[in-house]
Amino acid sequence: MVKSIQIEQFGGPEVLQYKNIDLPKLNPNEVLVNNKAIGLNFIDVYHRTGVYPIPLPSGIGLEACGVVEEIGSDVTLFNVGDRVSHACMPIGAYAEKQILPGEKLVKVPDGISDEIAASITLKGMTCEYLLHRAYAVKKTDTILFHAAAGGVGQLFCQWAKAIGCTIIGTVGSDEKIEIAKKNGCHHVINYSKENFAKKVMEITNGKGVDAVYDGVGLKTFEGSIESIKIRGTLLTFGNASGVVSSIDPKKHLAPKAIFITRPSVMPYTTIRQELELSASMVFDAILSGKIKVDIFKQYSLEDARKAHEDLASRILTGPSVLIP
């Protein structure tokens, strides 16, 4: 038996249960991973609350780093003792050990700690596809990133700065302005005090930005549309403030011929070669210094409720992990 966080109903942090579970036998294509560190991500809150419904009862968590303890008979990509990380289904990373499809794991290079790998695989690959594939950011671009002081935002802005584009970031408090600037933003707007769309237009001399990266959702959607230039792109990749329930092509898209996409990491890493390329780009960005990662806070696995309280209240201003 192994310790795991399980949920039997959707709700607040109180639905997270720290309990023993039995693991099934390995299928031929599967790997048993002994988790050393587990990533905390806002999508875990969506799964816990039912914003993104999952079958119940269920484990929770999509990201971890650990050591291969056992491999199925058909697994050829890994050996016992390899350090690996993942950011994928099946859900259940909040556990001492987890069984995963071998094709969903990636090797972690020397020079990257378990804690950093666990905190960077999902967020890092999210930044990779947002910057390079969902919309290929160019040096000449001006872009807007919402929640620039958040976990994804800090990594994204560092990486975008290395490309050489101009970055406008939004934050929800004055305390987070310096965090956003430290991580690469050229301009920072506190959207709790200012009309960010109006400010973006001032910064861009009325032109608007080439692309808006919006993981906030409901509260920022209309302003994001206003902030985009003619034939610009809106990448809506999260719903931290609530889900955008409807988009009116005539109202929202037609006036400026805006492109809109709703990307997520899974469709960009479904093919094994894409998964390996994305992970290698993330790890290379860390090892080369393009991205600097400092673990903000560590929690024990049994303190997952407290971790979720902090995650939902937005007091975690950097990558944080659970330690089994």
Give short role names for the model-derived ranges.
Residues 163, 171, 219-291, 324:
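Glycine-rich phosphate-binding loop and adjacent beta-alpha segment
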Residues 120-193:
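Mid-domain Rossmann-like dinucleotide-binding core that forms the NAD(H)/NADP(H) cofactor-binding site
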Residues 46, 86-147, 159:
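NAD(P)H dinucleotide-binding glycine-rich loop of Rossmann-like/cofactor-binding domains
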Residues 22-39, 49-92:
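Glycine-rich beta-strand-centered segment in the early N-terminal region that forms part
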